[in-house]
Amino acid sequence: GLVIGILIFVKMINGKATRNCNIMDTVYGEKNMAISSLSFSNGATSGSEELQPLCYYYIKSAYNCCSGGNYRNDYVSLCSLQDLLKQGVRGLDFEIYSINDEPVVATSTVDNYCVKETFNYIKFSDVINTIVNTAFSDNVPNPNDPIIFHLRIKSENKTMYKNFSQMLQSISNRLMGPDYSYEYKDDQGRIRNFGEVNISKMMGKIVIVVDRSNTTCLCDDCEEDCGEFYEFVNMTSNSTFMQLLRYSDIEYTQTPDDLINQNRRAMTIGVPNKGANPNNPSAAVMRSLGVQMLAMRYQMVDANVEENDMFFNEDGHAFALKPLNLRPIVTVIDDPVVQNPALSYATRTVEGAFYKLDV
């Protein structure tokens, strides 16, 4: 009886990956025709509604985008990623681990670089191949839009980072290029706000965002150990210009006005709370506070996911402009009135029959 029970359990576990894929294919397998790529007319100017900085947009995003089930005792798969791309999702969050000195995708519920809690993993090289071959093809509704990688790297293995950089080098034509390297540093080595870069510069490109809570290889002088990994990083989260917030920190913030004002020019990625099977955040609440990257758990089909999908479908794009009241407040001052020279405070000469004064 014990042997039979073990065999049944193993069969159930092995079938879980297939069931996850079947569910994702059923719900998300058809291309979402309500979404299309952003487009810009040749006559558009920097002040038009057509051309705006990245931080002005809500971005359709997925948390742990290769997960088709729970974050513990479950599976990750490329089928989940492929189905989300068909729905127009362009913000892709990954949890990265090091196995055999290679970057791999898995999930976990513990903050431990040595523990992954999925039964399997996906090589990040396979993720890159899927993105390059699918995300910019006619298999998705918005192939010209940017892809934003949000990488939460759970490793300090510098050899893995070096191998990671070689993978990124192999698709350098799809990345943002040297003008946006090293966290978009200027000529003096100062980190700039990548969120202020116009989204038109990113069309058809992959943007690399790395969680700065792990600073391994996020350094200018570590190429010997880390390869060129930092060169490919356009922005970091958990940093000055981009927050990484769990939903509870957004929903119960004590200073909502501060969060709104920060998100006028800086950025925030909002993600579900911790746990093996957390609830979806309310994208409506996150949008009301100006949060840009709305990272949902698409494998949990609930009212919050449906509301979020409806919002982007009605907008028609995976990058939806935030309302004016959540963007930077621009104060326009009228031209000053031309002054009467006779009323000037400039020194003038006053004289009479018996005096001459400069006043």
Give the ranges of each region predicted by the language model.
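Long, acidic (Asp/Glu-rich), low-complexity accessory segments flanking structured domains
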Residues: 1-91, 98-359
